[in-house]
Amino acid sequence: MSNFSMETLKLLRQQTGVGLTKCKEALAECNGNLEEAVVYLRKLGLASASKKEHRETKEGVIAAKSDARGTAIVEVNVETDFVANNAVFRSFVDGLVEDVLNHKADNVDALLQLPSFQDASLTVDELRAVTMQTVGENIRISRIKYFPKTTEESVGIYSHGNGKAVSITILSGLSDQESLAKDISMHIVAAQPLFLSKESVPEDALAKEKEIISSQIQGKPQAVIDKIISGKLGTFFQDVCLLEQAYIKNPDTTIQHLINGVSKTSGNSVEVKEFILWKIGA
């Protein structure tokens, strides 16, 4: 005969999210004591998590949030797409975004040792282990990033494919342009620029592109070669530089012209301060 009630079993499952069999085991081992059973399952989760650490994690989700605390983005990976869409896993990821915002964290290893937003009695790493036990798969926090909150900035976040790709755009100069920033983030997910502007293209990337172009037009007069290189570089910049790209919602204008228009209308100097594009596994 069990030494615990069905109500205690139900409470343990609600508190931990662990399966019925393991909850019964925990309560049996702890003589029906709910608090001790929770501790038992946490220890069990840490032990079982270490056995899963070697498993590949190619699926996952990217989540981001911006509020008065700043802006945070995280990528968390699991083994299967099924678990990537699991409610318990998604809740862990959402809580992790809160952890980054609360702790202003920008380093995964440091964040793992800090108290979790979802359960202050656990570190982020301990909660990760408990969640691994619940979903039955390895969970890896691949990367995080935190942007401090500053005045006169607008932040736009766009998520695509249920968190498979997420872009963040930060505009400086105005604090009421979240809608524009989000539209630019949507453009970024679709157009996938590599750099902000022509000036931000690294010298080695530019040299490599010139080398590729030159190899395709050998045997022509130098003046012709220079003209062709100039034209092809213009196309290259339009492909890889955000400000040079045709705006996806209005291809007749570029992102730079779009920003210039907002600056002119508002009387403020508006610029794309920063953007990022994260894709699962990229």
UniProtKB/Swiss-Prot annotation:
It is found in: Cytoplasm. Its main location: cytoplasm. The keyword Isomerase does not apply. It comes from the Bacteria. One of its GO terms (molecular function) is translation elongation factor activity. Keywords: Cytoplasm, Elongation factor, Protein biosynthesis. Pfam families: EF_TS. Gene3D superfamilies: 1.10.286.20, DNA helicase RuvA subunit, C-terminal domain, Elongation factor Ts, dimerisation domain. The keyword Chaperone does not apply. PROSITE patterns: EF_TS_1, EF_TS_2. GO terms for cellular component: cytoplasm. Residues 80-83 are annotated as: Involved in Mg(2+) ion dislocation from EF-Tu. SUPFAM superfamilies: Elongation factor Ts (EF-Ts), dimerisation domain, UBA-like. PANTHER family: ELONGATION FACTOR TS, ELONGATION FACTOR TS, MITOCHONDRIAL. Belongs to the EF-Ts family. Associates with the EF-Tu.GDP complex and induces the exchange of GDP to GTP. It remains bound to the aminoacyl-tRNA.EF-Tu.GTP complex up to the GTP hydrolysis stage on the ribosome. This is Elongation factor Ts. It comes from Chlamydia felis (strain Fe/C-56) (Chlamydophila felis). The gene is tsf.
